[in-house]
């Protein structure tokens, strides 16, 4: 039987970035719940991409990309057109697995997180035609 070499451990900066992302998503989810949203999914992964948070408020489902940066203004520019398309594709996959939400209004938001700042919720940050 052939031996396989274990993969090397992740670099410390990758671990730190992962933890920062998890912390930002937790802050974002708490902020959204305080604003009346119900969290339907977190870190929903598909072959097409990942959605950080899927949240519902009344007749609306929001697919929310969370961005954490040192400054809120830096976070605002962090969702690239390519990433937007991956989120739109992942949202389509989520809707296929949750058809009960397909008739609701759909929206693509961004939630920006920075240290010592309140989160900034960019409603309709981009649309599915991106």
Swiss-Prot record:
GO terms for molecular function: nucleic acid binding. It holds the Pfam family UPF0102. Belongs to the UPF0102 family. NCBIfam families: PRK12497.1-5 (NF009151), YraN family protein (TIGR00252). This is UPF0102 protein RPE_0358.
């Amino acid at each position: 039987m052939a031996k396989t070499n274990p993969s090397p451990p992740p670099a410390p900066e990758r671990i730190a970035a992962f933890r920062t992302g998890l912390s930002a998503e937790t802050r974002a989810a708490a902020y959204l719940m305080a604003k009346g949203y119900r969290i339907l999914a977190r870190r929903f992964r598909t072959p097409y991409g990942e959605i950080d948070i899927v949240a519902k408020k009344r007749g609306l489902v929001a697919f929310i990309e969370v961005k954490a940066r040192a400054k809120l203004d830096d976070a605002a520019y962090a969702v690239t057109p390519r990433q937007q398309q991956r989120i739109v594709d992942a949202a389509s996959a989520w809707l296929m697995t949750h058809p009960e939400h397909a008739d609701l209004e759909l929206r693509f938001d961004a939630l920006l997180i920075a240290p010592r700042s309140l989160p900034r919720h960019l409603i309709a940050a981009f649309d599915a035609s991106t």
